[in-house]
Amino acid sequence: MANARSLVAKANNINVGSLILMALVFGSCVANGEYLGGRRGLAANSGNPTVYDITKFGAVGDGSTNTFKAFLNTWIQVCDSPVPATLLVPKGTFLAGPVIFAGPCKSKVTVNVIGTIIATTSGYATPEWFLFERVDNLVLTGTGTFHGKGEAVWKADGCGKKVQCNLPPTSLKFRNMKNVEINGISSVNAKAFHMFLVKTENVNIQNIKLTAPAESPNTDGIHLSNADNVSILDSTIATGDDCVSVGRGSNNVTVERVICGPGHGLSVGSLGKYKNEEDVSGIHVNNCTMIETDNGLRIKTWGGSDPSKAVDIKFENIIMQSVKNPIIIDQNYGSRGGDSQVAISDILFKNIRGTTITKDVVQIMCSKSVPCQGVNVVDVNLDYVGKTGGEKKSSSGGLVGALCDNANVIFGGKLSFPMCPK
């Protein structure tokens, strides 16, 4: 047990109470079902051996009793079950945090959230509220809500675009996992990211709702890092930062039928912030709606970056309502200076329609060192409606049109603005 505690401490730097519980989790998953002093888990005697209700393990749904130990004790049973098992959060309001659900588990695991889970406002030694790690074949489902209580910490968040900064805790992090299904749940007022997928593979997210005020800092809806084969479908994201941000080393990502806004748009990046970042490829955004977002469809890379690539990125069939900066590639993002070394190529913006509050409909501002190649802008019809939206202007609308720098841009189809001069 001491060795397990030491390993977890080095890996996660978490507090002593969580270390003890984490050690129990690891021990339970390899010790033939033994639980707390050699007693067998409850599965053998339960009337429904595959469903474990957190209230049977001490959770109190009064909104004020910290139930994180009940969550972890329930998880021990679920993870150790030899048959597929469900951790159930029933109706009620449960205060908890932080919670670590660690695997590997013996069988498929479902976490079914019906009630509301409220985060504590302090006591976080780790950068997440709920962490799922090494739990393959996980299903997170239900009609319930994760309330991050971000309003308690947003004023103290001074990260902005700083190179080095410790963000407040992410609400839901999934790390080192394969074959994950997330559907139906809601996340409200995350302290920072609502969801963060890192080193994951084969993840399907659908029918979720993520919300936070437009002014809440760094509250990305879903952030990906080294994530492969991810689908984000049929969801609503209204938050204070990117609705979806696709980060380094992510490949084969599909975003479809997502309503985004308020927020900072649907973004690839920022890329190039860290050393030796892996390439990004196969990002396809289709049939999405953007409402009063600060940016629309964006690719952003840091100046002074190490070399990497961002290729095969497609934004198609997008509706925009009073969107600022509808189409933008920004290779001077952040505060570091110097030319970006992220090579951007094979990019498509097609069938983008609606209204904008920015006269520069298209801004393709690429790196002098590695100019963008193969950027296609096709069938973009956006009407300028003034700085605050409202009445539709004439089709000319006083638009500046497109701005292009260090980029090979190919325009085609019907355009509502003047093209970049060749």
From Swiss-Prot:
Q: Which UniProt keywords apply?
A: Cell wall, Cell wall biogenesis/degradation, Disulfide bond, Glycoprotein, Glycosidase, Hydrolase, Repeat, Secreted, Signal
Q: Which Pfam families match?
A: Glyco_hydro_28
Supply the gene name. PGA3
Gene Ontology CC terms, in alphabetical order:
extracellular region
- Keyword hit for Repeat: yes
Organism listed in the record: Arabidopsis thaliana
Annotated EC = 3.2.1.67
Annotated GO biological process: carbohydrate metabolic process; cell wall organization
Tell me the protein's name. Exopolygalacturonase clone GBGE184
